[in-house]
Amino acid sequence: MWRPSDSTVYVPPPNPVSKVVATDAYVKRTNIFYHASSSRLLAVGHPYYSIKKVNKTVVPKVSGYQYRVFKVVLPDPNKFALPDSSLFDPTTQRLVWACTGLEVGRGQPLGVGVSGHPLLNKYDDVENSGGYGGNPGQDNRVNVGMDYKQTQLCMVGCAPPLGEHWGKGTQCSNTSVQNGDCPPLELITSVIQDGDMVDTGFGAMNFADLQTNKSDVPLDICGTVCKYPDYLQMAADPYGDRLFFYLRKEQMFARHFFNRAGTVGEPVPDDLLVKGGNNRSSVASSIYVHTPSGSLVSSEAQLFNKPYWLQKAQGHNNGICWGNHLFVTVVDTTRSTNMTLCASVSKSATYTNSDYKEYMRHVEEFDLQFIFQLCSITLSAEVMAYIHTMNPSVLEDWNFGLSPPPNGTLEDTYRYVQSQAITCQKPTPEKEKQDPYKDMSFWEVNLKEKFSSELDQFPLGRKFLLQSGYRGRTSARTGIKRPAVSKPSTAPKRKRTKTKK
């Protein structure tokens, strides 16, 4: 007997599937380049925590293990004074910037930053044990210092980068939860903002929610979140706005090993060990942990203070700065020295500890240089529809809008809107454009008045001219040698005569 197949038949969608188009397909690049650079960017603060007085931050937290996310604001090229007015037609075209080169300059000497905790949950030294630990007392915390994992990172895109970390999840309603149970974990993806902590070697997690004793990690991360860049999510971005390219260098090794004090929430199963007598009858803590170390800091492995040229981005956006924004995210732990300062309370001929107050500060120095290329976009109906699907705010910045579809219903419009005799009317929507990043923290760098076409007057511009083969403009005229006369001389030649001997 014949029977139809039980397998599922998949029918293709009736409409064609939309395809993401690379920016090179509709963006035309010109041969006009501009150089732009920031001023010397400096930051000074306490490396472990912010100092507050009367609920006001007087000294911010500035650590070598924080993300520095620069929000670079560019001028509108459509309102820019161009050297050639015939480059584009404002009725059918719009101009955009393309980032073709950059250099992130770092000041200050190389150094290793030390962090720690005066009350760290360290119980036994399990690397070189002198004896078997018994039951811990009420409080076994000690003062421990360490250095962190070494990281150098630079990410460039026209949208803020994404980071991932593990946070506290939500238990199911049918699960009974007791005090002291291990909380569920949830992978959280969020925007990396300026001042967020990087992964220091203890994992990318929310230490404030997942370590309630505030003693398992050093001071600068025990009450905050450490994020790691979500490279997988940014690489899967269909438009490629968050990550044009990135530079990364990480290294770490485990320096010391010890275990934690406290009750082991999930004891070692009995079938994995044979208990002994005396002090071996009770098993010691099996919660092992290490102290990280970034090892040697050397100038031979530096990612900064050198130019990088963007020929082809990893995504579909090949360096186009939509919205006239560019985000540069920097991490450099090779310059994480924490300076100690001392101030005397009173002058004395003999040294006394109480006569001096000790302080800590961390300083950072940056310099950003860019090469931007002027590009044009022809506003065809197909291109405008695609850009509206990708990012509608781009068309709004270009003073374009889509007309709503016709409404078949008859709408009511009152003459006296403020009258108390009629029902309350809906508030009019705000016409001013809202900044999508107003609730986020970034280090804003305004380059609206820093553009220059004289590339040969700047270090990065001269490197670009040498690399690309373009000729820079010269401001002074050089002397031109007059060409020599090519026609033969009319003076008669003297005949040679032979002399008789």
Swiss-Prot record:
Record Gene3D superfamilies: Major capsid L1 (late) superfamily, Papillomavirus
InterPro entries: Capsid_L1_Papillomavir (IPR002210), Capsid_L1_sf_Papillomavir (IPR036973), dsDNA_vir_gr_I_capsid (IPR011222)
Biological processes per GO annotation: endocytosis involved in viral entry into host cell; virion attachment to host cell
Keywords tagged on the record: Capsid protein, Disulfide bond, Host nucleus, Host-virus interaction, Late protein, T=7 icosahedral capsid protein, Viral attachment to host cell, Viral penetration into host cytoplasm, Virion, Virus endocytosis by host, Virus entry into host cell
Major localization class: virion
Annotated GO MF terms: structural molecule activity
Basic residues composition bias: residue spans: 492-501
Stretches for region Disordered: 472-501
Quaternary structure, from the entry: Self-assembles into homopentamers. The capsid has an icosahedral symmetry and consists of 72 capsomers, with each capsomer being a pentamer of L1. Interacts with the minor capsid protein L2; this interaction is necessary for viral genome encapsidation. Interacts with protein E2; this interaction enhances E2-dependent replication and transcription activation.
Family: Belongs to the papillomaviridae L1 protein family.
Protein name: Major capsid protein L1
Upper taxonomic lineage: Viruses, Monodnaviria, Shotokuvirae, Cossaviricota, Papovaviricetes
